[in-house]
């Protein structure tokens, strides 16, 4: 058990290991990835977003990025290329996708999507296709 507030958690299982990703709002590094072998005892394995390099306000140099950082992320594992995918929206403006071959990292930014996919879910289908489902009043895939 970790004494921490991990909001918007997404849990996946890869083999016999469980991984969870969470929102971190304004903290850097962001999007912690937790690891558990029993769903009770958890440890921090890494961070999907190594640094919040999304603008000066995240450096706390006179601007304020509080509660404008990482929200509502999703984590997936793609067995075909042995890669973890992290998807999350930042600053209510864009969606970012990061990848790594191990949850400990290194994680790197794969792409940026110009729309904020809030509360999105990332799915690797049985045919190896990647899907993102998101929405509020309406759902999109």
Segments (PLM) and residue ranges:
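Carbohydrate-active catalytic/glycan-binding domains of CAZyme proteins
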Residues: 1-141
